From Swiss-Prot:
GO terms for cellular component: clathrin-coated vesicle membrane; synaptic vesicle membrane; vacuolar proton-transporting V-type ATPase, V0 domain. One of its GO terms (molecular function) is proton-transporting ATPase activity, rotational mechanism. SUPFAM superfamilies: F1F0 ATP synthase subunit C (SSF81333). This is V-type proton ATPase 16 kDa proteolipid subunit c. Keywords: Cytoplasmic vesicle, Hydrogen ion transport, Ion transport, Membrane, Synapse, Transmembrane, Transmembrane helix, Transport, Ubl conjugation. The record marks 139 as: Essential for proton translocation. V-ATPase is a heteromultimeric enzyme made up of two complexes: the ATP-hydrolytic V1 complex and the proton translocation V0 complex. The V1 complex consists of three catalytic AB heterodimers that form a heterohexamer, three peripheral stalks each consisting of EG heterodimers, one central rotor including subunits D and F, and the regulatory subunits C and H. The proton translocation complex V0 consists of the proton transport subunit a, a ring of proteolipid subunits c9c'', rotary subunit d, subunits e and f, and the accessory subunits ATP6AP1/Ac45 and ATP6AP2/PRR. InterPro entries: ATPase_proteolipid_c-like_dom, ATPase_proteolipid_csu, ATPase_proteolipid_su_C_euk, F/V-ATP_Csub_sf. Proton-conducting pore forming subunit of the V0 complex of vacuolar(H+)-ATPase (V-ATPase), a multisubunit enzyme composed of a peripheral complex (V1) that hydrolyzes ATP and a membrane integral complex (V0) that translocates protons. V-ATPase is responsible for acidifying and maintaining the pH of intracellular compartments and in some cell types, is targeted to the plasma membrane, where it is responsible for acidifying the extracellular environment.
Length: 155
């Protein structure tokens, strides 16, 4: 009888896995994006040290991806209670996977574009605007996952 109202005992496991997936996958994407872009900045700064601050944009954008995962992980963690239903728990898992995996993909895209863009901008400064536009499109991938995760986690 109590399972119909509150769900099985193991239901909270899936919600916790959603919070973990949100944080872990988005942090992996952000770390990769930061490392890959940072490598490009380090290589570029040997020849053009005056461009370091201008080239830091990909690193900042990669860091924002981790914030998306943190927001969803906190929302999921705050909604946990003893009697969570299995339906709600699977919604939380879906929300975590949504923001986490889209953050992972966005982080990879930001890292690759940031590395190549920073190195290219050092040789041809007119490439900067193109790099920023591509970075924005890569960042939006993570934002799409955040929007879906917010919809799922607040259902």
């Amino acid at each position: 009888m109590s399972e119909a109202k509150s769900g099985p005992e193991y239901a909270s496991f899936f919600a916790v896995m959603g919070a973990s997936a949100a944080m872990v996958f988005s942090a992996l994407g952000a770390a990769y994006g930061t490392a890959k872009s940072g490598t490009g900045i380090a290589a570029m700064s040997v020849m053009r040290p005056e461009m370091i601050m201008k080239s830091i944009i990909p690193v900042v954008m990669a860091g924002i991806i981790a914030i998306y995962g943190l927001v969803v992980a906190v929302l999921i963690a705050n909604s946990l209670n003893d009697g969570i239903s299995l339906y709600r728990s699977f919604l939380q898992l879906g929300a975590g996977l949504s923001v986490g995996l889209s953050g992972l993909a966005a982080g990879f895209a930001i890292g690759i574009v940031g590395d190549a863009g920073v190195r290219g901008t050092a040789q041809q400064p007119r490439l900067f605007v193109g790099m920023i536009l591509i970075l924005i499109f890569a960042e939006v991938l993570g934002l799409y996952g955040l929007i879906v995760a917010l919809i799922l986690s607040t259902k």
